[in-house]
Amino acid sequence: MNAVYAKYEMLRLVRNKRTFIFSLIFPLMLFVLIAGTNKDQTIDVGGLVLKFPTYYMVSMAGYGAMIATISGGARIAAERAVGWNRQLRITPLSVRTYFATKVLTSYAVALCSIALLYVAGIAYGVHISPFSRWIEMTALLLVGLAPFVGIGIFVGHLLTIDSMGPAVGGGTALFGFLGGQWFPIPEHGALHVIGQGIPSYWLTRAGQVGVGAPAWGLKGWIVIGVWSAAMAALAGWAYRRDTAKQ
C-alpha cells in the first residue's frame, strides 16, 4: 500500500465534516435519545434478558459501523464529480492500492463509530465481562462489515453525488430494519427468514456475542462470505465501468 496516498486519504476523511457527522454523530444521537429514555427497561432478545442500554449499544455499534462503511461511497462519488479519480488514473497508483486504501479508510471510520458507541454505552451503565467479550464482539463486527465496504465502493462508482444521500440513507435504513438493528425481529416467520439472508442480521448477531449470545454458525459465515464476494465483484465491475466512461 502507498503510505503517502493512505495518509492523504485519512487527512481528507478527517476534514470531511459532513461524512463524520453522519457516520459518527447520527448513531450516537440515536443511542443517547432512545437508550437514555429507556435506561431502566429490559428487553428479551432470543431468550437473553438485557437492559435496554446494553441491547441498544450492541445494536447501534453494528448500525453505526454499517453507515460508516457504506458512506465511503459518498466520498468516492464526490471524487468522481470533481475529476479526482481521473487524475489518480494517470499516476503510478495501482488499482489494488486504490481499493486497499478505500477499504482501510472505511474501516477506520467504522472503528471510530464503534468506539464512540462503546464509550456512550459504558457511560449509561453497560457492563460486559470478561473483557475478552469486547474483543470477540469487535472482531466479529469487523468481519461482518466486509460486505458493506464492498457496497460502499460499488455505489460510489455507480451513482452520482446527488443520488448518494437517498441511496445511503434508504439502504442503511432498510438493512437496519431487516437486520434487527432497530428492534429485535421475530424468531420465526417471513421477516426472520429474510433477515438471515442479509449481512446486517449477522452484524447484529455479532454485537450480541458480547452479551452472551452464541457466535455465528455455518449459515452466518456463508451469508457474510457470499455477500462479501458478490459485493467485491460488483465493486470491481463498477470501477471498470466508470474507468471506461472516462
Which residues make up each language-model segment?
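Juxtamembrane loop-helix boundary motifs flanking transmembrane segments in multi-pass membrane proteins
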Residues: M1-E9, V45, V95-F99, V126-P130, ...
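Short hydrophobic, aromatic-rich alpha-helical segments embedded in or entering the lipid bilayer
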Residues: M1-K7, Q181-W221
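Transmembrane helix-boundary elements of multi-pass transport/secretion proteins
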Residues: K7-V82, A110, I114, V126, ...
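Transmembrane helix segments
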Residues: V32-D40, G156-G197
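Transmembrane helix-loop junction
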Residues: A35-G36, G121-I122, V126, I153-H157, ...
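Helix-loop-helix units of permease transmembrane domains in multi-pass membrane transporters
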Residues: R75-Y107
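Short helix-loop-helix connector
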Residues: R89, L93, Y124, L159, ...
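Alpha-helical transmembrane segments and their short interhelical loops
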Residues: V95, F99-V168, L174, G217-W221, ...
